[in-house]
Amino acid sequence: LVTEIADTDNFINLSFLRLFRAARLIKLLRQGYTIRILLWTFVQSFKALPYVCLLIAMLFFIYAIIGMQVFGNIALNDETSINRHNNFRTFLQALMLLFRSATGEAWHEIMLSCLSNRACDPLSGLTKNECGSDFAYFYFVSFIFLCSFLMLNLFVAVI
């Protein structure tokens, strides 16, 4: 009946009234005691969320500073994983590289590009192949371990 009336040119389309179906959920929440408790627990868990986010930010900050000091002088090469978009030259680029590594995108290739005897940036003042470090193994594996297994699980546990 409503669609028949709405199809005529004189009336406004009344299909927006379907939005009021969502009001049934509010009525359901008022009646269900267990659903209210579950929702209250979910809201209360958000109080600990800023602390977990702060801990993750602190981990990224520490690893970005260490990465800039140890791997910041590696020459940029488009054929390796250390290129103009993916490097430790500045703090923001180091954070982006760490975020990319934390998501699991080719972190092992980045690690292998940071090993010792890599070419140095000409502006760094270092000789040709003394950049990089074998510390890259410990650096990247520990970062992936902390991000993937500890921080992500802690974040999910709070929610």
Curated annotation (Swiss-Prot):
It is a multi-pass membrane protein. Its main location: membrane. It is found in: Membrane. Glycans are attached at residue 13. GO terms for cellular component: calyx of Held; presynaptic membrane; voltage-gated calcium channel complex. One of its GO terms (molecular function) is voltage-gated calcium channel activity. Keywords: Calcium, Calcium channel, Calcium transport, Disulfide bond, Glycoprotein, Ion channel, Ion transport, Membrane, Phosphoprotein, Repeat, Transmembrane, Transmembrane helix, Transport, Voltage-gated channel. Residues 6-13, 72-135 are extracellular. InterPro entries: Ion_trans_dom, VDCC_alpha-1_subunit, VDCCAlpha1. It comes from the Eukaryota. The record marks 105 as: Calcium ion selectivity and permeability. IV repeats lie at residues 1-159. The chain crosses the membrane at residues 1-5, 14-32, 52-71, 136-155. Residues 33-51, 156-159 are cytoplasmic. Phosphorylated in vitro by CaM-kinase II, PKA, PKC and CGPK. It catalyses: Ca(2+)(in) = Ca(2+)(out). Voltage-sensitive calcium channels (VSCC) mediate the entry of calcium ions into excitable cells and are also involved in a variety of calcium-dependent processes, including muscle contraction, hormone or neurotransmitter release, gene expression, cell motility, cell division and cell death. This alpha-1B subunit gives rise to N-type calcium currents. N-type calcium channels belong to the 'high-voltage activated' (HVA) group. They are involved in pain signaling. Calcium channels containing alpha-1B subunit may play a role in directed migration of immature neurons. Each of the four internal repeats contains five hydrophobic transmembrane segments (S1, S2, S3, S5, S6) and one positively charged transmembrane segment (S4). S4 segments probably represent the voltage-sensor and are characterized by a series of positively charged amino acids at every third position. Multisubunit complex consisting of alpha-1, alpha-2, beta and delta subunits in a 1:1:1:1 ratio. The channel activity is directed by the pore-forming and voltage-sensitive alpha-1 subunit. In many cases, this subunit is sufficient to generate voltage-sensitive calcium channel activity. The auxiliary subunits beta and alpha-2/delta linked by a disulfide bridge regulate the channel activity. Interacts with RIMBP2. Belongs to the calcium channel alpha-1 subunit (TC 1.A.1.11) family. CACNA1B subfamily. This is Voltage-dependent N-type calcium channel subunit alpha-1B. It comes from Gallus gallus. The lineage of its organism: Eukaryota, Metazoa, Chordata, Craniata, Vertebrata. The gene is CACNA1B.
